[in-house]
């Protein structure tokens, strides 16, 4: 099953992906990670698209998306998890990534992009700081079970 974890930077997508990767024994990709599949971007994208299409009812693949252009790679049957956070939270986390300094142009960019995924179709909405990730993982497992008719592969 393909699980698309969608949202702006610094909303908690990677934290959720890391937890799911272990729980589901899944492969995980983010953004243009698929480029490691081939030397040519065009070929790598085709290989990745095929891999996602084949994983719809087999191996679990988590795809972390923070740019809208990559949404088109998700198969129709993928589980879509929208992860959001308050703008102040995003700015605070982004500043930590930049060693405590958030330049004004970066803050402006975050403000412009804030909410850009909010209208995207999703199966689950995770609100950073409000949603319990263990409960989110259980919900995702339940969706996998419903869509595939079988229990997901869970690591002990």
What label would you give each PLM region?
Residues 8:
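P-loop (Walker A) phosphate-binding loop of NTP-binding proteins
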Residues 74-94:
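Conserved phosphate-donor/acceptor-positioning beta-strand/loop module used by diverse small-molecule
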Residues 5:
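Hydrophobic anchor at the beta1->P-loop junction of P-loop NTPases
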């Amino acid at each position: 099953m393909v699980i698309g974890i969608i949202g702006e930077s610094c909303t908690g997508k990677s934290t959720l992906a890391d937890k799911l990767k272990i729980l589901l024994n899944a492969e995980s990709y983010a953004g243009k990670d698929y480029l490691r599949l081939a030397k040519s971007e065009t070929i790598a994208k085709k290989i990745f698209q095929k891999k996602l299409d084949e994983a719809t009812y087999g191996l679990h693949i988590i795809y972390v998306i923070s740019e809208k252009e990559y949404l088109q790679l998700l198969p129709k049957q993928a589980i879509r998890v929208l992860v959001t956070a308050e703008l102040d939270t995003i700015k605070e986390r982004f500043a930590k990534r930049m060693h405590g300094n958030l330049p004004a142009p970066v803050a402006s960019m975050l403000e412009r992009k804030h909410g850009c995924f909010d209208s995207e179709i999703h199966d689950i909405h995770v609100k950073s700081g409000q949603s319990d990730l263990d409960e989110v993982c259980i919900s995702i497992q339940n969706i996998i079970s419903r869509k595939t008719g079988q229990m997901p592969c869970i690591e002990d």
